[in-house]
Amino acid sequence: MSVCILAFPCEFPHNMLRTRFCTFLVLSTAALNSCAPAPTSTQTSASITVRNDVVFTPKNWPTAQLADLYLPTSTKSAPAVLLIHGGGWSGKERRADMTGIARSLAKRGYFVMNATYRLTPEWKFPAQRDDLEQAIRFMRSNAKEFNIDTSRLATFDYSAGGHLAALIGLDPANGVKAIVAGGAPSDLAFWPDGKLTGQLLGGPVKGNEKIYHEASPVHDVTTNSPPVFIYHGTDDDLVPLEHPNAFIATLRKHGVEHEVYWIEGRSHVLAHLFSGRAIPEAINFLDKHL
């Protein structure tokens, strides 16, 4: 089954807009790339508890990766969502644009893990995938402590994060039950000589066909793939419509349940800054499938 929604975006409340405007600045300047992590801390509100800067990779991992954990106050076993920040696989601090989404999910009763991963150009693929698979393992191995229902896991994010969310979610070994991928590249070979894809994959498509195929989620779809929620700006200038269209066509071909939320008239950045009801609809989608 597939559902298509065409939306004219509205603005977010001021605090969310401010958070998402920071995302635009980071995309433009990569100013937060070198920021050191803050000391580990725990914050508690009436409805959620947040544990910042939790190391989730093993001690012998190439570089320690951190996550902020959002725990709902409910005593019931909670479904879990892995948030994966964007930034062209090369930048962005995870809190720049994911804190609002993380809090919304946690208030809805989800355990949320907002995780980092190794960045290009220093680290080539599959380092990013390997890090995020460790995040999945962390949730499974700590399910009792954090009251996680590991049979209900999802991946979620936008742009490069959406690409990684799809890649992680479509691997059956990770046991993901739902995917949210916004503004996400689906076939990296659509950029045969792209700078960012070249940094990620070690060069252009020519001579690197195998790794481009391996890093493109469109090739991982099967009849057993989990449901997918896609949202994308109709005027996306960075991740052209051939990406969501190819992904949608492949999902349809294999009979995978999916919903599509088109954000009318928005570019890549503006669809992220002003996403209309894309995020609430994505959370509704998770409610149905987790």
Locate each region found by the language model.
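N-terminal cap/lid segment of alpha/beta-hydrolase-fold proteins
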Residues: 39-75
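Catalytic nucleophile-loop/oxyanion-hole region of alpha/beta-hydrolase
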Residues: 56, 93-97, 101, 113-150, ...
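Mobile cap/lid helix-loop segments that gate and shape the active-site cleft of serine hydrolases
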Residues: 59, 189-220, 226
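C-terminal catalytic histidine-bearing segment of alpha/beta-hydrolase fold enzymes
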Residues: 68, 129, 245-290
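Short beta-strand element of the alpha/beta-hydrolase
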Residues: 77-87
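Primarily recognizes the serine-hydrolase "nucleophile elbow" in alpha/beta-hydrolase
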Residues: 134-193
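Short beta-strand/loop motif that positions the catalytic acidic residue
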Residues: 230-232, 236
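Conserved alpha/beta-hydrolase "acid-adjacent" motif
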Residues: 237-243
